[in-house]
Swiss-Prot record:
Induction: By cytokinin (BA) in roots.
Coiled-coil annotated spans: none
GN (gene name): ARR15
Modified residues (4-aspartylphosphate): 79
GO biological process assignments: cytokinin-activated signaling pathway; regulation of DNA-templated transcription; response to cytokinin
Name of the protein this chain belongs to: Two-component response regulator ARR15
CDD domains documented for this protein: REC_typeA_ARR (cd17581)
Main location: nucleus
Protein purpose: Functions as a response regulator involved in His-to-Asp phosphorelay signal transduction system. Phosphorylation of the Asp residue in the receiver domain activates the ability of the protein to promote the transcription of target genes. Type-A response regulators seem to act as negative regulators of the cytokinin signaling.
Organism domain of life: Eukaryota
Species whose genome carries this gene: Arabidopsis thaliana
Post-translational modification: Two-component system major event consists of a His-to-Asp phosphorelay between a sensor histidine kinase (HK) and a response regulator (RR). In plants, the His-to-Asp phosphorelay involves an additional intermediate named Histidine-containing phosphotransfer protein (HPt). This multistep phosphorelay consists of a His-Asp-His-Asp sequential transfer of a phosphate group between first a His and an Asp of the HK protein, followed by the transfer to a conserved His of the HPt protein and finally the transfer to an Asp in the receiver domain of the RR protein.
Length: 206
């Protein structure tokens, strides 16, 4: 329902601009995802922690959800590993909120750990992106949301990003690998056309 309803609301809006809340404790990674989203014509708000994200969304216990209608956040992209409130914990809190649970949440991580990926998907994540996030990833996410979850590349069956990624996971051998931290900061490779979900499968086979 979330992606389809979001697509309808954006299509009916006079200014169908996607507003993305990006959460990452790394300043460099925040700038990278902000740049990619802006290149893709998205409005971006960045915060440096899960706690700040909750405050912005009105889930910190002080503001309630009174400001949600003014925020109009269409997508939340968060790092998995952060001090304090992790991306996984942030995901759970968002999905437990009746006011926010329909907002798609995408998890990012430099670690390709299948149990972690599966755990996030079970809790309601729309997709799990392997860092460094590429422009192709952002464009694909935006396209999926604007189409209401319809898969790209001539697919006739509508699938959510969650299911698309799960297909990639199911077809790859079980493994755990870690990308170097420096790779997530490689700005020169932002235009790589290989989406993260495909890189997860390829690295699992490596």
């Amino acid at each position: 329902m979330a992606l389809r309803d979001l697509s309808s609301s954006l299509s009916s809006s006079s200014s169908p601009e996607l507003h993305v809340l990006a959460v990452d404790d790394s300043f460099v990674d925040r700038k990278v995802i902000e740049r990619l989203l802006k290149i893709s014509a998205c409005k971006v708000t960045t915060v440096e922690s899960g706690t700040r994200a909750l405050q912005y969304l009105g889930l910190d216990g002080d503001n309630g959800s009174s400001g949600l209608k003014d925020l109009k956040v269409n997508l939340i992209v968060t790092d998995y590993s952060m001090p304090g409130l992790t991306g996984y914990e942030l995901l759970k809190k968002i999905k437990e909120s009746s006011a926010l649970r329909e907002i798609p949440v995408v998890i990012m991580s430099s670690e390709n750990i299948q149990p972690r990926i599966e755990q996030c998907m079970i809790e309601g994540a729309e997709e799990f992106l392997l860092k460094p996030v590429k422009l192709a990833d952002v464009k694909r996410l935006k396209e999926l949301i604007m189409r209401g979850g319809e898969a790209e590349e001539g697919k006739t069956k509508k699938l959510s990003p969650k299911r698309i990624l799960q297909n990639d996971i199911d077809s790859s051998p079980s493994s755990s690998s870690t990308s170097s931290s420096s790779s997530s900061h490689d700005v020169s490779s932002l235009d790589d056309d290989t989406p993260s979900s495909k890189r997860i499968k390829l690295e699992s086979r490596g």
